[in-house]
UniProtKB/Swiss-Prot annotation:
Name of the protein in its database record: Uridylate kinase
Gene Ontology terms: biological process: 'de novo' CTP biosynthetic process; UDP biosynthetic process
Entry keyword annotation includes Kinase: yes
Residue positions binding UMP: G60, D80, T141, G142, N143, P144, F145, F146, T147, T148
Length: 247
């Protein structure tokens, strides 16, 4: 059930939360861990309970990895379409978890799937958000060659979100992969241009440029840290903030 706020003023009115498909695997090697879904539903419910409007984009890497098949000769467009279907499956699972927690949610797909999801319509999405429903955007942008990170940034801009929150397995952006390099240092704050110049690999080039060109702040944080999401929305300094540099 959506929990009521504890009296703190939320810093953001509307957010776009980007989850990787791999995040839904939990400790499994493939598929969806129901415990992870339930935990994410609880955390999203806390945000709804304090009046924050939540849009969600989920990747599909836990169900389908197109890179290996593409390398083996599969047509890239076909692989990308299969990846879009994987994101729809994840979106349906997340909607189910939210509804079981008594949180109203709707899936809007960029590709038409009559009887399964609603088709994406910006004006309808805005109305659902204003009605305190969680809107889960599925099937990426609906076009091949675009990542779900790009889709998340695009949807955030379209719905006039205050920030993109990218949930990862590490607590921010580092100079190198902290799992491989024990000397990697964490950044608390970066500009879009610094991310591009340093080739930090936070998101793909298209996604970062979209955020930069439309002045959309981006925060990268560790989704496995209890309370991190709520802390960010209350103005806490979790992870790494990426935004426009000073002119």
């Amino acid at each position: 059930m959506a929990q009521q706020g504890s009296g703190y003023q939320a810093r953001y009115k509307r957010i776009l939360l980007k989850l990787s498909g791999e995040a839904l695997m939990g400790s499994e090697e493939f598929g969806i861990d129901p415990k992870v879904l339930d935990r994410m539903a609880l955390e999203v419910g806390q945000l709804v309970g304090i009046g924050v409007q939540v849009g969600l984009v989920i990747g599909g890497g836990n169900l389908f990895r197109g890179a290996a098949l593409s390398a083996a000769g599969m047509d890239r467009v076909t692989g990308d379409h299969m990846g879009m279907l994987a994101t729809v499956m994840n979106a349906l699972a997340m909607r189910d978890a939210l509804e079981r927690a008594n949180i109203s949610a709707i899936v809007m797909s960029a590709i038409s799937m009559v009887g399964v999801t609603d088709h994406y319509d910006r004006r309808k999405a805005m109305r659902h958000l204003n009605s305190k429903e969680v809107v889960i955007f599925a099937a990426g942008t609906g076009n091949p060659f675009f990542t779900t990170d790009s889709a998340a940034c695009l949807r955030a801009i379209e719905i006039d979100a205050d920030v993109v929150l990218k949930a990862t397995k590490v607590d921010g952006v580092y100079t190198a992969d902290p799992f491989k390099d024990p000397h990697a240092e964490k950044f608390d704050h970066l500009t879009y241009d610094e991310v591009l110049d340093r080739k930090l690999g936070v998101m793909d080039l298209t996604a970062i440029c979209l955020c930069r060109d439309h002045k959309m702040p981006l925060r990268v944080f560790n989704m496995n840290k209890p309370g991190a999401l709520l802390n960010i929305v209350h103005g806490g300094a979790e992870g790494t903030l990426i935004e426009e540099g000073e002119q």
